[in-house]
């Protein structure tokens, strides 16, 4: 039972507290090299925590108050559906669509007509319908855009006069599946002309912000909770805003933020109880960042238990990653991997002290999660969780072996291991047992075969990680575990920029397969499939401006503050 916090603070106090938090510094040292330049994993330098946990636990805003929740329900009743497609789009971007999931699906299921009937509505409406229906798993053929081409099969240049339509076609193109040349052409055509229009300043201020935002990262790739915070400000400045919808969005954001703060407080108490921060002084102590990851993957308020469990998973992954990446010797790592694989608590006396507490923390967490599943669902999930952790540790061990030997694998060898070592498959397996009820053994076996949506999600986050954590000009000199850029450069002889370009191409290809996997029938719930997609989105988000997970530059910190600690200001 979560104890009711004794301290509530206003938005202004939260802002002041947040500025104190943001002044904290964090360093994350990689591999150390001695004077002889031999690789050394043992690190005696502690990692200072990146957030003041006592201050974090005191943060509250008044929007957890019951009267705001009641007001939110009242606003729901007052809403009028005027333009269905635009309303659905606004609900999604404002972070409100989870209130109306069944209604939205019913609407999208009912509005589809033949291609010829939709085309007269113009590029904007056609692109919007295409994007929304594909997002929700409905079949929509790429040929819906054929009528917007000229006799040569190219998109009509007259479309450039419809800036909003051009923008929405650009966003729709990122719902592309494999072998959809129309959408690939659409993406290239729209990106080229939107950049030109921006450069020539032939655009109004309201649309300019949307275009710049989309060109930086398309909507389909964005973390939706963060997008909601950004879009609320954009929507408020619009002349056609719906004041009821705007107020509901602000209230809902603040209410959900208060719920998230409560979840964070619970996980901070758990983390403190493990003692890992004190015993593993070499490891990163980044619970707030771990929680931010989880919020990005499953933010809806009703999934609090899943958020808390998955944040614990992320914390254990971070600690074990640092054992392999920063501290353990090769012999120690082989021994730890063996103990995890055998799941043998009686063997921990063979481990050094820092590994004993690490394994016991993992062992206790998995058994506790499995106990709850057995009690509530009657299913023993320990074998599945054991396998997921063993697979992760074996992938970490392979990377450590490459490091100690100085070996740089081929790109394919690297990726075959790295899509597991990024930890996404492990997180997704745990998520299944948090969000898909009742647990079905046949579904779990299907999950164990690594359904395409899981592999694609993992590959996207791995490639985004490698692009973000490999600073330009430093990547080829790194003494760390080789990343995909080094592997590609060594294998092909290409320059670093060509390697980055190829990785960006692989990300687009993985998204195509992900889009396909979302529309194919599978035994998984829409919530679970959405989680897998959101894992990929978090990869794009966290590594968009470098390594937002490990190094606290201003952009990731500002995002965390706005999402977790700063309520939206009071209404006029």
UniProtKB/Swiss-Prot annotation:
Binding site for Mg(2+) 2: 321, 325
Tissue specificity annotation: Expressed in flowers and fruits.
Composition-biased stretches (Low complexity): 8-28
CC cofactor note: Binds 3 Mg(2+) or Mn(2+) ions per subunit.
Disordered: annotated segments: 1-45
Pathway note: Secondary metabolite biosynthesis; terpenoid biosynthesis
One cellular component (GO) term of this entry: chloroplast
Subcellular location: Plastid, Chloroplast
Cofactor: Mg(2+); Mn(2+)
Keywords in alphabetical order: Chloroplast, Lyase, Magnesium, Metal-binding, Plastid, Transit peptide
Enzyme Commission code: 4.2.3.-, 4.2.3.15, 4.2.3.106
Transit peptide endpoints, chain numbering: 1-27
Binding annotation for Mg(2+) 3: 465, 469, 473
Motif (DDXXD motif): 321-325
GO biological process, one term: diterpenoid biosynthetic process
Binding residues annotated for (2E)-geranyl diphosphate, in chain numbering: 284, 321, 325, 462, 465
Pfam families listed in its UniProt record: Terpene_synth (PF01397), Terpene_synth_C (PF03936)
Residue intervals passing through the bilayer: none
Protein origin, superkingdom: Eukaryota
Main location: plastid
Family: Belongs to the terpene synthase family. Tpsb subfamily.
Comment text on domains: The Asp-Asp-Xaa-Xaa-Asp/Glu (DDXXD/E) motif is important for the catalytic activity, presumably through binding to Mg(2+).
Biological role: Monoterpene synthase (mono-TPS) involved in the biosynthesis of monoterpenes natural products, constituent of coffee beverage aroma. Catalyzes the conversion of (2E)-geranyl diphosphate (GPP) into linalool and beta-myrcene, and, as minor products, cis-ocimene and trans-ocimene. Not able to use geranylgeranyl pyrophosphate (GGPP) and farnesyl pyrophosphate (FPP) as substrates.
Protein's UniProt name: Linalool synthase TPS2, chloroplastic
